[in-house]
């Protein structure tokens, strides 16, 4: 069985992407959770991760252990390992676009990330709108609208895919900070929040405890 090493569900945006993909796709995995911000966190992560960060996916291939780090690389591996789950679009052009927006999410939107830290269980309406954040949000909304309109929905490329998993943290961030969207972008964000994997993640984030002052106190 696959093993997925993650951090706190409430705060670790990188961890939640492969967690949501596996959960939404119904792919069984063993979860290894390491609490962030604790005295032994670095040592615990080092037992599993060659880079010292989470997430890490652990698999056994031909009798040898395989470790994959980086959320997008993990999602790519899962999509290839389980082709029947159709985690990328079947159409070549749509698949290229899905990879493009996933990569853009992976490397971009720094203003939004910095000023709207991941925090599923708290609410900070109106906070975080620093320079550059509005432009990031506008770009996200454009991606969502164009992808859903092109594919016909309900998700970015029809059925739930790697691209949706990659945008999961932004969906939660916009909800936490009370960002109002409209039209197809708003409808997509709500469909994501209603997806079983995101509902379950939000429930677990609410219940897990282990608060992190560096996140919780930013807009307290």
Located regions from the model:
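Active-site-flanking alpha-helical
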Residues: 79, 170-171, 202
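Short Asp/Glu-rich motifs
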Residues: 40-42, 193, 211-212
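Acidic/histidine-enriched, glycine/proline-rich intrinsically disordered or flexible terminal extensions
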Residues: 205-220
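GST-like domain detector, emphasizing the conserved glutathione-binding G-site
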Residues: 1-129, 219
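GST-like fold's C-terminal all-alpha helical module
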Residues: 105, 109-194
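Conserved beta-strand edge residues that scaffold enzyme active sites
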Residues: 35-37, 188, 206
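A generic structural-conservation signal
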Residues: 31, 183, 201-202
């Amino acid at each position: 069985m696959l093993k997925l090493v993650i951090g706190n569900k409430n705060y670790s945006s990188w961890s939640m992407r492969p967690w949501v993909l596996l959960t939404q796709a119904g792919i069984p995995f063993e979860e290894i959770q390491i609490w962030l911000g604790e005295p032994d966190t670095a040592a615990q992560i080092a037992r599993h991760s060659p880079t010292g960060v989470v997430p890490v996916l652990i698999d056994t291939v031909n009798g040898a252990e395989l470790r994959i780090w980086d959320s997008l690389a993990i999602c790519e591996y899962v999509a290839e390992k389980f082709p029947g789950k159709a985690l990328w679009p079947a159409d070549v052009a749509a698949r290229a676009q899905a990879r493009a927006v996933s990569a853009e999410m992976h490397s971009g939107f720094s203003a939004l990330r910095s000023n709207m830290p991941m925090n599923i269980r708290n609410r900070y309406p109106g906070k975080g709108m620093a320079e550059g954040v509005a432009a990031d949000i506008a770009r996200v909304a454009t991606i969502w609208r164009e992808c859903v309109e092109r594919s016909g929905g309900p998700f970015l490329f029809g059925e739930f895919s790697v691209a949706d998993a990659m945008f999961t943290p932004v969906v939660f961030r916009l909800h936490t900070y009370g960002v109002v969207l409209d039209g197809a972008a708003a409808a997509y964000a709500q469909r994501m929040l209603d997806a079983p994997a995101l509902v379950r993640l939000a429930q677990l984030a609410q219940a897990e405890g282990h608060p992190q002052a560096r996140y919780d106190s930013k807009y307290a």
